[in-house]
Amino acid sequence: LWVDGKSNTATLKADGNDNRLRAQQRFGENNGMTIDVTGNNNNDLSNPSFAGAAQAARTDANNATGILFRRGSVWQHGSENEMTVIVDNSNNNDFAMLQQGSNNSISGNISGTGSNQAAVAQLGNNNSTNFNQSGSGNNLGVTQ
């Protein structure tokens, strides 16, 4: 999913296993985005990847974006941002989230079984990050 310009908003929902999600909201304005996933091995690409504080927040979103941050790359570039990620009772789901500039947020959740990974990089402006994880073997890395 690629969303350009002005008032932006997006909802991505995946039910099932072995899906791959990628989304970008670029070039500003009001942004938004909700990601709701139920199922296993989404964005997993047969593990292992990430690790150690979600691989140091996916190497600071691949060094502020020579791009490549993969494993369910979700990117908001500029303006008011926000993002909600919900993963429900699932295993082995991987997300790399980048908010580059403006008012930022990101909420999280990821509840249920385990081995889920999230890399969160918020580079520039007002930032925030709330996250809950439940289960075992989960990994979260945040860089601001």
PLM region descriptions:
Residues 1-144:
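Low-complexity repeat regions of mature extracellularly deployed or surface/particle-associated proteins
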